[in-house]
From Swiss-Prot:
Lineage: Eukaryota, Viridiplantae, Streptophyta, Embryophyta, Tracheophyta
DNA-binding region(s) in UniProt: 557-625
Stated name of the protein: FACT complex subunit SSRP1
Entry GO MF terms: DNA binding; histone binding; nucleosome binding
Gene name of this polypeptide: SSRP1
Function: Component of the FACT complex, a general chromatin factor that acts to reorganize nucleosomes. The FACT complex is involved in multiple processes that require DNA as a template such as mRNA elongation, DNA replication and DNA repair. During transcription elongation the FACT complex acts as a histone chaperone that both destabilizes and restores nucleosomal structure.
Amino acid sequence: MTDGHHFNNILLGGRGGTNPGQFKVHSGGLAWKRQGGGKTIEIDKADVTAVTWMKVPRAYQLGVRIKAGLFYRFIGFREQDVSNLTNFIQKNMGVTPDEKQLSVSGQNWGGIDIDGNMLTFMVGSKQAFEVSLPDVAQTQMQGKTDVLLELHVDDTTGANEKDSLMDLSFHVPTSNTQFVGDESRPPAHILWETILKFADVGSSEEPVVTFEGIAILTPRGRYSVELHLSFLRLQGQANDFKIQYSSIVRLFLLPKSNNPHTFVVITLDPPIRKGQTLYPHIVIQFETEAVVERDLALSKELLVEKYKDRLEESYKGLIHEVFTKVLRGLSGAKVTRPGSFRSCQDGYAVKSSLKAEDGLLYPLEKGFFFLPKPPTLILHEEIEFVEFERHGAGGASISSHYFDLLVKLKNDQEHLFRNIQRNEYHNLFNFINGKNIKIMNLGGDGQGASGVVTDVLRDTDDDAVDPHLERIKNQAGDEESDEEDEDFVADKDDSGSPTDDSGDEESDASDSGGEKEKSSKKEASSSKPVQKRKHKARDDEGQEKKKPKKKKDPNAPKRAMTPFMYFSMAERGNMKSSNPDLPTTEIAKKLGEMWQKMSGEEKQPYIQQAQVDKKRYEKESAVYRGEATVDVDSGNESD
């Protein structure tokens, strides 16, 4: 890259273990983003005060200290990366990286270096370990020579690790020359006072504010929510969670449409754990019209020094607004509210289903959020494409009132939002198209995909003219079957073939007959209730929806196969052998995905096979119709 360097699989070190992500250093600073979404760190070059390199097991570690006193550790660089990044940082940030060495001797005596909010234990000139002082919840003297540090133990730290550091102690002899004291204040006392200046001591005492009886949907229950200086606590009858503010990535304030409740979502990284279940989102539900008044338990000095322009002495207003403002002021997390999207009922979300759960899908400015269960956040930048799908293929009239939205991520993960009302299509399409997200079956790639959306929106009462929709309707054929083969994936190379008609259930004359035969068939359907066309009309009138299928003539010619069918026959065996545990429906789905990704040249052999079979079918159909006509005529004459 001309403007910087980009690295994958770089670990961010911290008390919660290491998390892999993408690291980028550019002329304006550096950034790290967790793999799969979540925590993001952006550092402006003007805030960088020191940079260090250290050789750690199997890799190199880049340490970055900023003006606020925070220290970040990025692990996973190769030896050849060190010189390139060193030159780039010197040139663009004006900071010369220092080289530190890691002590591996196992020696447990040495010196203590406190720089900003980091405590480093040094063995000679080498570093043994580091402790972030804001992670210290309590410190106390033990006798005259020992200093005990107790660290915050919360339900997010350690979610990815089996073990977590809880406490450690330092023995400072009276002969120590680094922390000079006297008889009343020995060296250990001097160290204790120094740590007190940076540690988060006292934050575990009385909460700043408490909200009683709050309904939390995930993890489910009613909790008392306590907001402390550095963490929040959820106290329920069966569960008790403690969450560091440093684990909060973002807050979401999302009103429910036509409902007296409002969601407040706390997104965490790392998540909290309950048994074997991880909860990356805490979904809180407030009564929208509830009004509260709260006074904060903060001294005026602390309010002015640390929380100036972030918190007030007291709050009065809607409970979800008060809660969000106080939590934002204490944690520093950003708040996301609904953006420009509006549903057909002027709401902020559309009703849909994810897996087996009904909920609301919120199209936001930078992502989609499905609530309340399972809470699913999808960022726009993680989406490879979206695809509109019809609700069902069984021909039932109710299916025309709903459609599905498939979201395919760049990591090959898929989310299918089902049962979205048909009248929400235009709003969703305009929003997604405005965000420049690729819409798979609205790009003119094939008539089959276009026909899916045409089926979804057929007979719509919306008078608004959508040029994209009109183009789709013009492209889509009128000959599509209502009961297609379950493995069939329509494509521009085979759409419009005779196999699109449901020949198993209709008269064979409709398979390849001309327009005259089709019109005569429609006229005959009014007087012959056994015809399928009459069956469709009775569905539209709300009467009997289904009638017994007409028995197929065993002498009728076999229908022509589509290119995809030939492809499926050729590849199904390979798919089964390589994935023996894959269900039949998943095999069909995988084959469909493979077919869609194939180029025109790759599809050509199967297209040629289908063309040959199509000619065979047309010839056999002509012969079959001729023989059937002779039999009918001769039968009438004999009567």
